[in-house]
Amino acid sequence: MNITISLVAYAQKFTETESFESLLRMSDIIKNKLNIIVFDNGSTDYSDVALPSGFHSLTYIYNKDIVERGTRIAYETSLTHSNDEWLMLLDDDTSLTEDYLSLLLAELGSKIRDTEIVAYCAKIYDGVTQISPTASETLDMLLFPKEAGVYKQDISGISSTLTLRKAFIEDIGGFSKEFPLDYLDHWLFSQIIFNQKKVEVLNCQLNHQLSVQDLSSLSEERFYSIFSSEYRFYKAYKPELFCQLNKKYVKMVLKGFLKRDSGIRWKSLIKVMLKVKTNKPEGKRGLE
């Protein structure tokens, strides 16, 4: 069985990213089962760069859309180009391993696989902290990491290495335009749970650097994008936690205003909370 990998590149040349370099290190047996689609959101078009051989296929797509330059358009484009049953989402700063891909491919090819499982993921670490997958029914997600196993509720995580059944994504209408970049991953997990499907966490650890862990490293624009997306997500999909989120933001505003945390852009948080949303959220999508 082959799988399609949607690798989303940004500022760095795709051949020099952590994820692409890790793919190049795979054995020929693994490479020959991978259809790689590199979707480049960066400022430089590398269409003229010679593509390495060894993969079942390797396609480079430069994003010429000047408005939408995020993960959603990358995933949606990869979905339409893929002829495989499964699509892996991959950030450019996640390091894949031979062990993980071998385990994943074995699971996907198993004849006794639970057909209700529509997503697989690894345990993702940033340093010593497991950042994905985690519980979803709390704002303190990192305090409740998920172990290997099959889940049908209370689970969320990042999109990198999340491998999705193509038919499931098509059945729910594709990747939501509500979240062109941030919180699309949380939306995906929420849709799996809402549609009573399952996620399997494989017993394998991978490394990924999560930028949101260090707020001081974020630009003003990036900070606003992350927190406005979080606010919209909880308002539309987790209303039971929305009141807690507002309290959390108020505390962050006070902390930022008093300059106890230079990473908090408190004016941006106020803007997020006061912004009047004129468009109704898409809501949860049920299977046909």
Positions of predicted regions on the chain:
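Short aromatic/hydrophobic "clamp" motif used to bind/position activated sugar donors
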Residues: 87
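Short beta-strand-to-loop element that shapes/binds the nucleotide-sugar donor at the catalytic cleft/hinge
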Residues: 120-131
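Non-catalytic, C-terminal membrane-associated alpha-helical segments of glycosyltransferases
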Residues: 220-230, 235, 239-288
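Short, flexible, basic/aromatic active-site loop/helix in glycosyltransferases
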Residues: 135-155
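A conserved acidic beta->alpha catalytic loop
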Residues: 22, 39-49, 94
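A short, conserved alpha-helix in the catalytic core of glycosyltransferases
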Residues: 156-157, 161-162, 168, 172-173, ...
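Short, well-formed alpha-helical segments that are part of the catalytic scaffolds
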Residues: 12-27
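Glycine-rich, basic loop-to-helix element that forms the pyrophosphate-binding segment
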Residues: 65-82
